[in-house]
A protein has these predicted regions:
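Start-of-helix signal in alpha-solenoid helical-repeat scaffolds, especially tetratricopeptide repeats
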Residues: 24, 31, 69-73, 92, ...
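TPR/TPR-like alpha-solenoid helical repeat scaffolds
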Residues: 66-82, 106-132
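Hydrophobic membrane-insertion alpha-helices, especially the h-region
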Residues: 8-27
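TPR-repeat structural position
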Residues: 47-48, 88
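Alpha-helical transmembrane signal-anchor/signal-peptide segments
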Residues: 30-47
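Cytosolic-side transmembrane helix boundary signature
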Residues: 1-6
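Extracytoplasmic/periplasmic/luminal assembly and interaction segments
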Residues: 42, 53-101
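Internal alpha-helical scaffold/solenoid segments in large eukaryotic proteins
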Residues: 24, 28-35, 52-53, 59-61
Length: 133
């Protein structure tokens, strides 16, 4: 009887590990795909497509994955570029997308707390300057 229980436990553990690996692989695949879509849109000069791609990549957060950090940097660069060009509305869209992406990826911890703090500071500075409400 003990052997049977041990066999069931081993099978349950193996199945759980396989399911977890499949989940992580699927999430990693979608993360890479969304990042690539963001990069392609960025190269085309498509603001909305780039923001959506990078934002979606961050939503697929996997701890210690460098692509999430690259997506965050790209969104930050898009926001800064628009801010320098005087397009406050687009800058706010990008800063808010970056901030909300990390909030959306919250689970046991909130990832990207440094990005959130930086975005909060920029948003607070830019909202009073926004003309289109």
């Amino acid at each position: 009887m003990t052997e049977r229980i041990a066999g069931i436990v081993v099978n349950a553990v193996v199945i759980s590990v396989i399911c977890l690996l499949l989940f992580l692989a699927g999430t990693w695949w979608r993360l890479q795909d969304q990042f690539a879509l963001g990069e392609e849109a960025f190269r085309r000069g498509d603001f909305s497509g780039a923001v959506a791609g990078y934002e979606s990549a961050i939503h697929m957060y996997i701890p210690f994955n460098g692509t999430v950090e690259q997506s965050a940097r790209q969104l930050w660069n898009i926001a800064e570029t628009n801010e320098r060009q005087g397009d406050i509305t687009r800058a706010l869209i990008a800063y808010r997308a970056l901030r909300s992406s990390f909030y959306a990826a919250r689970w046991l911890v909130t990832p990207g707390t440094d990005w959130i703090a930086r975005c909060d500071a920029r948003i607070a500075a830019l909202v009073p300057l926004q003309k289109d409400r």
